[in-house]
Design a protein with these regions (language model features):
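Conserved N-terminal helical subregion
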Residues: 10-13, 82-185, 193-198
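N-terminal Rossmann-like FAD-binding beta1-loop-alpha1 element of flavoenzymes
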Residues: 14-41
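Conserved Rossmann-like nucleotide-cofactor binding loop
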Residues: 24, 47, 179
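Glycine-rich FAD pyrophosphate-binding loop
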Residues: 33-55
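N-terminal FAD cofactor-binding segment of flavoenzymes
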Residues: 54-94
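Conserved FAD-binding catalytic core of PHBH/FMO-like flavoproteins
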Residues: 70, 156-160, 165-166, 171-279
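FAD/FMN-dependent oxidoreductases across multiple families
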Residues: 246-340
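C-terminal helical "tail/cap" subdomain of flavin- and related membrane-associated enzymes
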Residues: 325-416
Length: 416
């Protein structure tokens, strides 16, 4: 349920408090409440504002594994009608005739061919999460509400809100983004580095069908991705040198569309813009630890990576699945869900996977965002090898779906 203002109780006691009501944070809260763990989610913006058409024009790639997490949290039923499936992935180098083609029919999972994932508007994902929150009496969604301080000790944590309310819990889950209060109050340090790139984003409609094919063209200034949405719509994620981004954003619309057509190769036919153009600077963020006394970090409070592999939110939803599992297991055994032993299990499970993926994505950026001859040769050899080795190709396909490593129960489709 959603509460706002100061009409609710001035002091709330719960098992877990989630700071941040974004895609990862509210998914975390829904997963816990679905499994019977009392949870409060503190969300600084109102649902009405977040669900508005102009609040967030971004889209998100939801991998197959992430769909299973959302399904286990009872959210996917609200998202599926808005989700465009990714059936094929085509990776190409602009300066080479070689390309890699991944076909979902070449891999079986759960007894049948599955999409690699789905593309959704962020606003549709938010609306689905709000709908699920209303269905869960054990989820108190405080929105709008702003956390201003966190006090922690051996027995629990206290979160104070700007309106005077207080939330007491065994565990604080920091899902409050790159400028995380939970992370900063716990004294967890960050490793960060920036790319000389920003992502230009927009949504387009086109006259020719995309047939569920996601296309990524590697260009010297950064990758250019066309991601299939519902109907004849696609999401554009265009990584470009920061010095050139303003020029492209200010182009007259017809010239900008011409640039999209040129970069995509024209296979989409006539193009029209459905949203404004926007740009986001690209950087990497890695928390040195994902846990502290009475605190666990998920999503962009813990990590942010380059969108080259489309794994940003998927990494966060793997956090959700792992942390929800360790919390639910402890709760059902009558243990303290915020104890060092419980949190250490989450840290062991998630941090290595996250650091590895961040390093892989960083390597891909440097491998593909240039046209240096020896590196170009290495790219060509790599794509040729992948095309000729079906087991290697299936390995990369499983990574795209998110079904590798030690899988939490939610990803396996097993209820918590």
């Amino acid at each position: 349920m959603t509460e706002s203002g100061t009409t609710a109780a001035q002091e709330i006691t719960t098992e877990v408090v989630v700071l941040g009501g974004g895609l990862a944070g509210l998914s975390m809260a829904a997963a816990l409440a679905t499994a019977g763990v009392p949870v409060v989610c503190i969300d600084r913006d109102s649902p009405d504002r977040q669900a508005g058409d102009d609040f967030d024009i971004r889209t998100t790639a939801v991998a197959y594994a992430s769909m299973k997490v959302l399904e286990g949290a009872g959210v996917w039923k609200h998202m599926e009608p808005c989700a465009g499936p990714i059936l094929d992935i085509r990776v190409a180098d602009q300066f080479s005739p070689l390309f890699v083609h991944y076909d979902h029919k070449d891999l079986t999972w759960d007894g049948k061919n599955q999409p690699f994932g789905w593309i959704l508007d962020n606003k549709d994902m938010r609306r689905a999460l709000f709908a699920r929150a209303k269905e869960l009496p054990g989820l108190h969604h405080l929105a709008p509400a702003q956390a201003v301080s966190i006090e922690r000790n051996r027995s629990g944590a206290t979160v104070k809100l700007a309106d005077g309310r207080v939330v007491k819990a065994r565990l604080v889950v920091g899902a409050d983004g790159r400028r995380s209060l939970a992370r900063e109050s716990a004294g967890i340090k960050l490793r960060t580095w920036a790319y000389d790139q920003s992502a230009i984003i927009c949504t387009i409609r086109h006259s020719e069908p995309h047939n569920g094919v996601a296309v990524e063209h590697f260009l010297p200034n950064g990758p250019f991705a066309v991601l299939p949405m519902t109907e004849n719509r696609s999401s554009i994620v265009w990584s470009e040198k920061r010095s050139l981004v303003d020029m492209y954003l200010k182009l007259p619309e017809d010239q900008f569309i011409d640039e999209l057509t040129r970069r995509s190769g024209g296979y989409l036919g006539d193009i029209e813009l459905l949203t404004r153009r926007d740009a986001w600077p690209l950087s990497v963020l890695l928390a040195e630890r994902f846990i502290a006394e009475r605190v666990a970090l998920i999503g962009e409070a813990a990590h942010a990576i380059h969108p080259i592999a489309g794994q940003g939110l998927n990494l966060g939803l793997r956090d959700v699945a792992a942390l929800a599992e360790v919390i639910v297991d402890a709760h059902r055994l009558g243990l303290d869900v915020g104890s060092p032993e419980v949190l250490a299990r989450f840290q062991r499970w998630r941090r290595f996977d996250t650091v590895l993926l961040a390093a892989v994505c960083d390597g891909l950026v440097h491998l593909f965002s240039n046209n240096i001859p020896p590196i170009k040769l290495a790219r060509d050899v790599g794509m040729a090898v992948v095309n000729r080795l079906p087991p290697l190709k299936r390995f990369f396909m499983r990574h795209a779906m998110g079904v590798v490593g030690e899988l939490p129960r939610m990803i396996k489709g097993v209820p918590l």
